[in-house]
Curated annotation (Swiss-Prot):
It catalyses: N(6)-[(R)-lipoyl]-L-lysyl-[glycine-cleavage complex H protein] + glycine + H(+) = N(6)-[(R)-S(8)-aminomethyldihydrolipoyl]-L-lysyl-[glycine-cleavage complex H protein] + CO2. Pfam families: GcvP2_C, GDC-P. The keyword Oxidoreductase applies. Its EC number is 1.4.4.2. Keywords: Oxidoreductase, Pyridoxal phosphate. It comes from Colwellia psychrerythraea (strain 34H / ATCC BAA-681) (Vibrio psychroerythus). GO terms for biological process: glycine decarboxylation via glycine cleavage system. The modification N6-(pyridoxal phosphate)lysine is found at K713. The keyword Membrane does not apply. Disulfide bonds: none annotated. Coiled coil: none annotated. This is Glycine dehydrogenase (decarboxylating) 1. GO terms for cellular component: cytosol; glycine cleavage complex.
Length: 965
C-alpha cells in the first residue's frame, strides 16, 4: 500500500504568508494545547467570547495581502529609489555625518541594543545606563553646565521644555513673556510658539540684542545662530539675569568642540541636537536632543536622568534618578509629559564621542571649520563676501542672482538653505570634502573663478586667520574622563560595546512581558531599510520633489493606518506617544475654539489612566476631572454620566484607553463615547492598547474622534532601550484642519499655518519604514491574526497564573484582553514579600519584570504579545509559579523575611564566589529551574539603593576605578 502524495498549489509554495508564521510565536500544535487549557475550540471562538460584538468589524481591514520578505524589501527599495539624495548644505540643525561602522553594525543594527526597554529595572540595564551616563558627561563637558538629562525627543521639543523650565524657576514671576532670538532655527521657533500658545505665554521674536529691553521670564538664543553668526552673548545674558530672566542657549554640539561653552557665557540651560555625532539625518529623525542646566534647577529638569548609586554590596551602580519629577508618578504635576525619549540615538552619539575622543572630535570640528574658512576666503576674493565675519561652519550670503545660483546648485546635485529672501546659506559638515568646496566655488561664482582649495588653505595657515573671535575660542578641556580616551581602535571599541551589551537583558534573550508596552518581535527585515542611504541621508528640509520616495511611503502608510484605525486623516509628525497626545489635544482645543467654544477646557480622565494622559492635558491648559472606576476596574458609568452632564457647558473631552488599562474590553465603550458627544465633548482614545484592536475593531468604529498610535508598540518599531518611538495621530474629518503643520515644509494645504509639535515635518521619518514593512509583510490577515494571538497568549498566561495568584480584573466570561493584572498585595500581607522583591527575583530566572504597580499599586501587569511561543510563555509561568512557592517558604517561616532568595535578589556571580552562609543553596539562588542553566543571564550588580541614589545625586561619570568588576 502506497501513501498518497500531497501536492501543494503554486500559491501555497510561494510562501506569501510565511512571515505571519515567523511573527506569531505559537505553532499550530502549541495553539491547540493553549486552547485546550482555555476550554475553547478555536482562536476565533475565544475572540468571540472576549471582544464585544457591537464593536466587532465584519471584514478584514482593507490593506494589502501579505508579502514575502524578499518581495516586500524589493518593493520598498523601489520606493526608496525615488528619493534623490543630494549633497546637503541646508544645515538648520541637520547635518551630514559619518556613522562609524563599528557603531552602525553593533549598536544601531544590533537587537541587543534596540530591543531593550526603558531601564526601570536597572540591575539588568547597566550597559546602556553606562552609555547614557557617558552621554550626560559628554553634554556636561561640551555645554559647560552641571547637570544633563539622558535625551529628549528633538531640538524643538527641548527648546519648548527650556521655556517651561524658565517659567518654573525664573524669579520674574509677574512676567508672562518669553523672548526668542530671530536667529534661532525656524522650526524651533515654530515648536516653541505652539507650546507657548497652549501654556498661555506671550512670545516676542526679535534680534538677540533686543532681549534685555523686554520684561521677560526667559530667553532663547541660538549659538551659533541659524545664519551661522557666532556672537559673544555673555553681556546680554548678564543683562537678562539682572532683570531676573532665565537664559536658554540652543547650541550646535560640534561647534562646542571649538567654541567657548554656553555655560562659561552664563547660560542657565543649554539645549540642542546630538544628531551630527554619528546619527544619520533620516529625513528628520530620530535623533537625541540634549538638555543641560545648573544643579540648582535639577528638580525642574525634564526627561530621564541617569545617576550613580550603590548596590547592596556597596558597589557603584547606575539607575534612573529623581523619577518623582516624571509623568508616571506625578501625573498632571510632572515637569513634562515626556515618557520615552531617544535612548538608542543618545547611545550612538555617546559611542561616537567615545570612539573619536577629544582629539578626534577636535580634528573633525577643525576640518569642518577650515573648509568653511576656505569657502569664505575664496568667495570674498571674488567679491562675494559672507554676511558674518565670525562663524563655525555656516556661511550666509546676500545675493542678487539667487535663482541662478540655486539652479546651478540643483544641477550639481547640491541643496542650500534658501528660505530667506535675497539670501542663501551654506552649512558644511563632517562629510564635506575639499572637492565639495571646489564645486561650491563653481556654483557660487560660475566656472573660471581660478580658485584653488590648497592655495587658499596655505594662505589661511600662513596668516593664522581665525573666524572665531578670540574671546570665544574654547580653552576649557573636554571629555577628560578615561572612557573618552581609551577606546579609539576598532578592536577596543567593539569589545567595549559588546561588554556593555552583555550587561543588559533585551528581547534577544527572553520575553519582556511589560504590560502596556507591547514588547513584540522587531523583525530583522523590518529594520534593514532604516540604514539604507536613500532613507538615512535625506535632509528633512530638502526640496519636496527630491523626497518622492519618502512621500510615497508615508502616504501609503497613512492610508493603511487610516484603514486600521477607522479615522479619516493621519499626521505623522508626533515623534512619541506623549507628543501624539499633545497634538491630539491641541486639535481638540482648536476645534472647540473654531466653534466659539474656547471655554471648553475640562478633560475627564479615568482613575486608571497612564500618567501621560493628565500630564498631556495640563500641557494644553485643560482642567482635569477624574472619573471613578468600579470594583471590576471599568469606568463607573454613573459617575461618568453625572460628571459629563454637570460639566457639559465646559466639557472638552475624555481621554480613555481601550481595552482599558486594567486589561479588559469594557462593554460600555460605545456608550461612553455617546455620553461625551451628547454633552459637547470629544473622545480621545489613547492608542496604547491598539495591539488588542487591529483588525477586530477600531477607535473610529467605536466612536472616538482622535487617537495616537504607539508605532513602537503595536506596529513593531523597537523600544531602543528607551526610545525612539513614534506617535502619529489619527482624527475624524472634523478635526483634520487642526493637525500640525511645519514652518519650512507644508505638510498639507488644509493645515497650512498651523503650529508644529516636532522639529521635523514627519517626525522621526526614517523609522516609519519599520511600520510600513510590518503591515506589508503581515497583510490584512496577518495584522488581524497578530491581535488574536496577543489575546490568546494573554488569556493562556492569565489562566495558568490564576491557579497561583489572584487575577485582579477580567471581562465577560472571565477573560482578559491582551494583558492581565496579577495581584501581589495578599502576598505582601502574608509574607512581607513585595512586588519589588518579586521583580528582582525574576532576574534570577532570566526575565525582565512585568510592569510593576501600574495601574494598581502592588501588582504585576503582564502583556506577553503575539510573538512569544508557548515554550517561552511556559518558561515564564514556571518562574512565576516557583516564585510563589518561594513566598510560601517565607510565609511558613522556613526562610526569614529578611534573608531569602526574594529579599536578596538579584544574585550575581560575585555572590557565589564568596563563602555562602544563606539559608538557601547556591543552586536555588542562581539556577532555580533547569531552563535557566542552559541560558543563564547574570545581573552585573545586586539590588540598587534608590534612596541613596536620590539623596546623593551624581549624574556624571564616576572615577574609572569604579568600572572595574
Amino acid at each position: 500500500m502506497t501513501s498518497k502524495t500531497i501536492v501543494n498549489s503554486l500559491a501555497e509554495l510561494e510562501q506569501t504568508q510565511d512571515f505571519i508564521r515567523r511573527h506569531i510565536g505559537p505553532s499550530e500544535s502549541e495553539t491547540q494545547a493553549m486552547l485546550n487549557d482555555l476550554g475553547v475550540e478555536s482562536v476565533d471562538a475565544l475572540i468571540d467570547e472576549i471582544v464585544p460584538s457591537d464593536i466587532r468589524l465584519a471584514d478584514l481591514p482593507n490593506v494589502e495581502e501579505s508579502k514575502t520578505e524578499v518581495q516586500a524589501l524589493a518593493d520598498l527599495k523601489a520606493v526608496a529609489s525615488l528619493n534623490k539624495v543630494n549633497d546637503t548644505y541646508i544645515g538648520l540643525g541637520y547635518f551630514g555625518t559619518l556613522t562609524p561602522n563599528v557603531i552602525l553594525r553593533n549598536v544601531l543594527e544590533n537587537p541587543g541594543w534596540y530591543t531593550a526597554y526603558t531601564p526601570y529595572q536597572p540591575e539588568i540595564a547597566q550597559g546602556r545606563l553606562e552609555s547614557l551616563l557617558n552621554y550626560q558627561q559628554m553634554c556636561i563637558d561640551l555645554t559647560g553646565l552641571e547637570l544633563a538629562s539622558a535625551s529628549l525627543l528633538d531640538e524643538g521639543t527641548a527648546a519648548a521644555e527650556a521655556m517651561a523650565l524658565a517659567k518654573r524657576v525664573s524669579k520674574n514671576k509677574k512676567s508672562n513673556l518669553f523672548f526668542i532670538s530671530d536667529d534661532v532655527y525656524p522650526q524651533t521657533i515654530d515648536v516653541v510658539k505652539q507650546r507657548a500658545e497652549m501654556f498661555g505665554f506671550d512670545i516676542v521674536v526679535a534680534p538677540a540684542a533686543d532681549a534685555a529691553e523686554h520684561d521677560i521670564f526667559g530667553a532663547l538664543i541660538q549659538y551659533p545662530g541659524a545664519s551661522g553668526q557666532v556672537t559673544d552673548v555673555s553681556e546680554l545674558i548678564a543683562k537678562i539675569h539682572d532683570n531676573k530672566g532665565i537664559v536658554a542657549v540652543a547650541a550646535d554640539i560640534m561647534s562646542l568642540v571649538l567654541l567657548k561653552s554656553p555655560g562659561e557665557l552664563g547660560a542657565d540651560a543649554v539645549i540642542g541636537s546630538s544628531q551630527r555625532f554619528g546619527v544619520p539625518m533620516g529625513y528628520g529623525g530620530p535623533h537625541a536632543a540634549f538638555f543641560t542646566t545648573l544643579d540648582k534647577y535639577k528638580r525642574s529638569l525634564p526627561g530621564r536622568i541617569i545617576g550613580v548609586s550603590k548596590d547592596t554590596r556597596g558597589k557603584n551602580a547606575l539607575r534612573m534618578a529623581m523619577q518623582t519629577r516624571e509623568q508616571h508618578i506625578r501625573r498632571e504635576k510632572a515637569n513634562s509629559n515626556v515618557c520615552t525619549a531617544q535612548v538608542l540615538l543618545a547611545n550612538m552619539a555617546a559611542f561616537y564621542a567615545v570612539y573619536h575622543g577629544p582629539q578626534g572630535l577636535k580634528t573633525i570640528a577643525n576640518r569642518i571649520h577650515r573648509l568653511a574658512d576656505i569657502l569664505c576666503l575664496g568667495t570674498a576674493t571674488k567679491g562675494l563676501t559672507a554676511v558674518h565675519a565670525n562663524y563655525f561652519d555656516t556661511l550666509t550670503f546676500n545675493v542678487d542672482n539667487k535663482d541662478e545660483i540655486v539652479a546651478r546648485a540643483l544641477a550639481a546635485n547640491a541643496n542650500f538653505r534658501t528660505d530667506v529672501d535675497g539670501q542663501i546659506s551654506i552649512a558644511l559638515d563632517e562629510t564635506t570634502t575639499r572637492e565639495n568646496v571646489a564645486q561650491l566655488f563653481d556654483i557660487l561664482l560660475g566656472e573660471g573663478h581660478g580658485l584653488n582649495v590648497s592655495d587658499l588653505d596655505d594662505q589661511i595657515v600662513a596668516s593664522g586667520h581665525s573666524s572665531i573671535p578670540a574671546s570665544l575660542v574654547r580653552e576649557s578641556a573636554i571629555l577628560t574622563h578615561p572612557v573618552f580616551n581609551s577606546y579609539h581602535s576598532e578592536t577596543e571599541m567593539l569589545r567595549y560595546i559588546k561588554r556593555l551589551e552583555n550587561k543588559d537583558l533585551a528581547l534577544n534573550h527572553s520575553m519582556i512581558s511589560l504590560g502596556s508596552c507591547t514588547m513584540k518581535l522587531n523583525a530583522t527585515a523590518q529594520m534593514i531599510p532604516v540604514s539604507w542611504p536613500e532613507f538615512a541621508n535625506m535632509h528633512p528640509f530638502a526640496p519636496v520633489n527630491q523626497a518622492q520616495g519618502y512621500k510615497a511611503m508615508i502616504d501609503e502608510l497613512a492610508k493603511w493606518l487610516v484603514e486600521l484605525t477607522g479615522y479619516d486623516k493621519m499626521s505623522m509628525q508626533p515623534n512619541s506617544g506623549a507628543q501624539g497626545e499633545y497634538a491630539g489635544l491641541i486639535a481638540i482645543s482648536k476645534y472647540h475654539e473654531s466653534r466659539g467654544d474656547s471655554h471648553r477646557n475640562i478633560c475627564l480622565i479615568p482613575a486608571s489612566a497612564h500618567g501621560t494622559n493628565p500630564a498631556s492635558a495640563m500641557m494644553v491648559d485643560m482642567k482635569i476631572v477624574i472619573v471613578a472606576c468600579d470594583k471590576e476596574g471599568n469606568v463607573d458609568m454613573a459617575d461618568l454620566k453625572a460628571k459629563a452632564e454637570e460639566l457639559a457647558d465646559n466639557l472638552a473631552c475624555i481621554m480613555i484607553t481601550y481595552p482599558s488599562t486594567h486589561g479588559v474590553y469594557e462593554t460600555t465603550i460605545a456608550e461612553i463615547c455617546n455620553i461625551i458627544h451628547d454633552n459637547g465633548g470629544q473622545v480621545y482614545l489613547d492608542g496604547a492598547n491598539m495591539n488588542a484592536q487591529v483588525g477586530l475593531t477600531s477607535p473610529g468604529f467605536i466612536g472616538a474622534d482622535v487617537s495616537h498610535l504607539n508605532l513602537h508598540k503595536t506596529f513593531a518599531i523597537p523600544h531602543g532601550g528607551g526610545g525612539p518611538g513614534m506617535g502619529p495621530i489619527g482624527v475624524k474629518s472634523h478635526l483634520a484642519p487642526f493637525l500640525p503643520d511645519h514652518a519650512l515644509i507644508n505638510v498639507d494645504e488644509a493645515t497650512k499655518g498651523n503650529g508644529a509639535v516636532s522639529s521635523a515635518p514627519f517626525g522621526s521619518a526614517s523609522i516609519l519604514p519599520i511600520t510600513y514593512l510590518y503591515i506589508a509583510l503581515l497583510g490584512k490577515k496577518g495584522v488581524t491574526d497578530a491581535t488574536k494571538y496577543a489575546i490568546t497568549n494573554a488569556n493562556y498566561v492569565s489562566k495558568k497564573l490564576s491557579e497561583h495568584y489572584p487575577i485582579l480584573y477580567s471581562g465577560k466570561n472571565g477573560r482578559v484582553a491582551h494583558e492581565c493584572i496579577v495581584d501581589l498585595r495578599p502576598l505582601k500581607a502574608s509574607s512581607g514579600v513585595t512586588e519589588v522583591d518579586m521583580a528582582k527575583r525574576l532576574m534570577d530566572y532570566g526575565f525582565h519584570s512585568p510592569t510593576m504597580s501600574f495601574p494598581v499599586a502592588g501588582t504585576f501587569m503582564i502583556e506577553p504579545t503575539e510573538s512569544e511561543s508557548k515554550v517561552e510563555l511556559d518558561r515564564f509561568i514556571e518562574a512565576m509559579v516557583c516564585i510563589r512557592d518561594e513566598v510560601r517558604k517565607v510565609e511558613s517561616g522556613e526562610w526569614a523575611s529578611d534573608n531569602n532568595p526574594l529579599h536578596n535578589a538579584p544574585h550575581t556571580l560575585a555572590d557565589i564566589t564568596e563563602p555562602w552562609d544563606r539559608p538557601y543553596s547556591i543552586q536555588e539562588a542562581v539556577f532555580p529551574v533547569v531552563a535557566v542553566t542552559a541560558n543563564k543571564f547574570w545581573p552585573t550588580v545586586n539590588r540598587i539603593d534608590d534612596v541613596f541614589g536620590d539623596r546623593n545625586l551624581i549624574c556624571s561619570c564616576p572615577p574609572i576605578e569604579s568600572y572595574i568588576d
